[in-house]
């Protein structure tokens, strides 16, 4: 029998404490970093992190090997199922990189001729994964050389590592097929493939991540999963881990199979797990929060662990991978000292895991336990977290009927059919980033920085006018991030200097920390909007980030309901919208790209969420008069699940990421009777390629088949912050040309029918 471990974490970050992998990747893609250098960077990061975890005292160390982009994409490579369009792509193996690296990155980023795979959010987080593309004819061909090499390297370095892989159910549940077949048709076959793979792994333990087991899974599928894991269990040392939700379904499905361990997320739902566990396998208790930044209540956690230990073997872990939190609090030197004591980043969470495991074995670190108790008491009684009184009525969340608003807006805006616009941000050039850095370092005065941003806004306005766009944006040069910008201007938030987490690939974000009562001390965007609007006769959109997205993309206080915090943010945005209207804004965009992320994974819990999420958005926007058009933007979402909520938001225009998913959202819009304005994106900005006119025209034609042309907008998928000016200009020329061509066709059809 494989001996049990006592302390571990669910998974590891890959990007590096100082974003080393990000810079190596971007250098490799641009040709300034060699394949050998990229491989060495990934190797160093993997080795150093394993060393740190071992030194911290963990007795089982998770490893995914050298990952260059995403765990789901790693699994696609492992199973040999890159999309068909890339299968004939000639690989050019670089020393130190896997032989499939060209197909790997083509799947993630596309090529000049071929689009990338779809990308969407990982369950209810702000991390993104590459969606596998399968078909009924898919054949899995193990390509495990890189994985086995990486595991062997760590074993020779003396580490007790545990490979972490995406499990069969989760991999297939998150896949899409190109022929309409069911990905789960491959379930039994994939279990057979994993059986062969696990037999080759030289480690006592192997971890298979099955977060899909916390979602709604059909009973017949659970039976097939149970049968599959019964086969894998014979290997010994198989640890099936779940996270992001209650573990009752997983425990019921997997109990009694002879698995070595089952992991559950006690942060999301500890009570259910306590009831469901029968004490037969090692329970890996995810009791340290892996996706938020607050210190653990060590005394309460130890009490829970002791109750579990009375029923069977227990190991201490994080609730999910530490991919979702910053590396270490020690890198932050400028935080509010009081709030700092309330926090724990990745390094500190590992220390908490070890302390709890030691305490469970009878060795209590009294200084750490006392410090945690003192911090929790201070946070509970701090004036920074005091409640804000708000007398909110149903009328505060309501506007006039859409038909009334649409008539007023059509008269106020006088736009052509199929109006063209962008989502908000324009390229953040080296000059913009330099000016911001120099300003923060004190090398530019506020006046000099303001002048630099105003000059950039003027350039963006001129460029849009030259391109022929109908509704303009100011380009957001003053914003380093669409959430952090507002967090720095609202009370109740703090921001970090090195609190980076991976969003996707080389893209990293620094989520702000929402620690207290949210208020708006002064206007945040009005002066930038007013300057932009003064430069043009065309309408310029006021640009705000919505309350749910600010919530979803921040580390949020966990001592009051999310609905209460969302309304606090909404009231601050409501004040900003009132000021924008007073400054002359006729269109105000309130982005909610993250509204899908916080949706509970089980249907029984979703209605309550959508009520308060929709309510917060409407609370922020309902102050706008009828003639002011409210836009919102959404991306990376499974819109079919949210179509009713999108309608309930009651935004006048909703722009949606759609190009990468071949306009799949259109069917949902059509079947729902969606009657509001909509702009399904016709250009995938996440791929570094300029779309062909025929490609954009085809997407626009598809949209016209499902959307009333009087309510259809033409726009890219997302903001243009990460793109260069050359590709942005070229792509927008294509977008405008496609819109003009479609307008001509509409007018011709109208004259013919007349």
Curated annotation (Swiss-Prot):
The keyword RNA-binding does not apply. Keywords: Amino-acid biosynthesis, Metal-binding, Methionine biosynthesis, Methyltransferase, Repeat, Transferase, Zinc. One of its GO terms (molecular function) is zinc ion binding. SUPFAM superfamilies: UROD/MetE-like. 5-methyltetrahydropteroyltri-L-glutamate binds at residues 19-22, 121, 507-508, 553, 597. Its EC number is 2.1.1.14. InterPro entries: Cbl-indep_Met_Synth_N, Cobalamin-indep_Met_synthase, Met_Synth_C/arc, UROD/MetE-like_sf. Its cofactor is Zn(2+). Zn(2+) binds at residues 633, 635, 657, 718. Binds 1 zinc ion per subunit. Pfam families: Meth_synt_1 (PF08267), Meth_synt_2 (PF01717). L-homocysteine binds at residues 423-425, 476, 591. L-methionine binds at residues 423-425, 476, 591. The active site is at residue 686. Pathway: Amino-acid biosynthesis; L-methionine biosynthesis via de novo pathway; L-methionine from L-homocysteine (MetE route): step 1/1. One of its GO terms (biological process) is methionine biosynthetic process. It catalyses: 5-methyltetrahydropteroyltri-L-glutamate + L-homocysteine = tetrahydropteroyltri-L-glutamate + L-methionine. Belongs to the vitamin-B12 independent methionine synthase family. Catalyzes the transfer of a methyl group from 5-methyltetrahydrofolate to homocysteine resulting in methionine formation. This is 5-methyltetrahydropteroyltriglutamate--homocysteine methyltransferase. It comes from Corynebacterium efficiens (strain DSM 44549 / YS-314 / AJ 12310 / JCM 11189 / NBRC 100395). The gene is metE.
């Amino acid at each position: 029998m494989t001996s049990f471990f006592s302390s571990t974490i669910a998974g590891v970050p890959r990007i590096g404490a100082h974003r080393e992998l990000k810079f190596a990747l971007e250098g490799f893609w641009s040709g300034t970093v060699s394949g050998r250098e990229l491989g060495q960077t990934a190797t160093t990061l993997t080795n150093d992190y394993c060393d740190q975890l071992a030194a911290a005292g963990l007795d089982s160390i998770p490893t995914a090997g050298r990952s260059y982009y995403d765990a789901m994409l790693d699994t696609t490579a492992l199973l040999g199922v890159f999309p068909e369009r890339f299968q004939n792509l000639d690989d050019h193996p670089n020393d130190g990189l896997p032989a499939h690296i060209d197909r790997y990155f083509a799947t993630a980023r596309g090529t000049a001729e071929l689009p990338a795979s779809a990308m969407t959010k990982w369950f209810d987080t702000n991390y993104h994964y590459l969606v596998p593309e399968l078909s009924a004819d898919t054949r899995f061909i193990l390509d495990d050389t890189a994985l086995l090499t990486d595991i062997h390297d760590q074993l020779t370095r003396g580490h007790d590592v545990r490979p972490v892989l995406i499990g069969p159910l989760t991999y297939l549940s998150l896949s899409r097929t190109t022929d309409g077949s069911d990905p789960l048709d491959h379930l039994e076959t994939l279990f057979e493939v994993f059986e062969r793979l696990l037999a080759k792994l030289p480690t006592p333990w192997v971890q298979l991540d099955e977060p899909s087991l916390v979602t709604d899974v059909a009973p017949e599928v659970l039976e097939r999963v149970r049968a599959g894991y019964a086969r894998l269990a014979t290997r010994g040392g198989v640890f099936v881990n779940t996270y992001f939700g209650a573990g009752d379904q997983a425990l019921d499905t997997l109990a009694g199979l002879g698995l070595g361990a089952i992991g559950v997320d006690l942060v999301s739902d500890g009570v259910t797990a306590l009831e469901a566990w029968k004490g037969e396998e090692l329970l890996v208790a995810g009791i340290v929060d892996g996706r938020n930044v607050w210190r653990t209540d060590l005394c309460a956690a130890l009490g829970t662990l002791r109750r579990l230990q009375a029923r069977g073997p227990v190991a201490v872990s994080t609730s999910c991978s530490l991919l979702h939190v910053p590396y270490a609090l020690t890198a932050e030197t400028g935080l509010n000292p009081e709030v700092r004591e309330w926090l724990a980043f990745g390094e500190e969470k590992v220390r908490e895991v070890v302390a709890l495991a030691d305490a469970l074995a009878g060795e209590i670190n009294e200084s750490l336990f006392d410090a945690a108790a003192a911090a929790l008491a201070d946070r509970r009684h701090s004036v920074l977290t005091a409640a804000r009184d708000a007398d909110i009525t149903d009328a505060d969340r309501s506007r006039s009927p859409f038909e009334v608003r649409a008539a007023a807006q059509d008269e106020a805006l006088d736009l052509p059919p199929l109006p063209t616009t962008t989502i908000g941000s324009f390229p953040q050039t080296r000059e913009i980033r330099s000016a911001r850095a120099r300003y923060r370092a004190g090398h530019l005065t506020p006046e000099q920085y303001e002048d630099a941003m105003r000059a950039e806004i003027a350039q963006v306005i001129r460029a849009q006018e030259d391109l022929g766009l109908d509704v303009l944006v100011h380009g957001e040069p003053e914003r380093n991030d669409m959430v952090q910008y507002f967090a720095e201007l609202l009370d109740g938030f703090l921001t970090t200097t090195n609190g980076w987490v991976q969003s996707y690939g080389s893209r990293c974000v620094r989520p702000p920390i929402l620690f207290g009562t949210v208020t708006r001390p002064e206007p945040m965007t009005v002066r930038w909007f007013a300057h932009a609007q003064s430069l043009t006769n065309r309408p310029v959109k006021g640009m705000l980030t919505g309350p749910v997205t600010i919530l979803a993309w921040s580390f949020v206080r966990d001592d009051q309901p999310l609905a209460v915090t969302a309304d606090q943010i909404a009231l601050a945005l409501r004040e900003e919208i009132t000021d924008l209207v007073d400054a002359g804004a006729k269109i105000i965009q309130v982005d909610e790209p993250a509204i899908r992320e916080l949706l509970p994974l089980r249907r029984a819990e979703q209605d309550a969420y959508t009520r308060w999420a929709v309510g917060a958005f409407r609370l922020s926007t309902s102050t706008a008069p009828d003639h002011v058009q409210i836009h919102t933007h959404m991306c990376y979402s499974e819109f079919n699940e949210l179509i009713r909520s999108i309608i309930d938001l009651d935004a006048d225009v909703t722009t949606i990421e759609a190009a990468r998913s071949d306009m799949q959202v259109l069917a949902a819009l059509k079947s729902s009777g969606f009657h509001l304005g909509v702009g399904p994106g016709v250009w995938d900005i996440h791929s570094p390629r300029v779309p062909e006119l025929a490609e954009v025209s085809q997407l626009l034609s598809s949209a016209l088949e499902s959307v009333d042309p009087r309510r259809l907008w033409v726009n890219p998928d997302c903001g243009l912050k990460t793109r260069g000016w050359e590709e942005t200009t070229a792509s927008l020329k294509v977008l405008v040309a496609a819109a003009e061509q479609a307008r001509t066709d509409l007018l011709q059809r109208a004259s013919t029918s007349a």
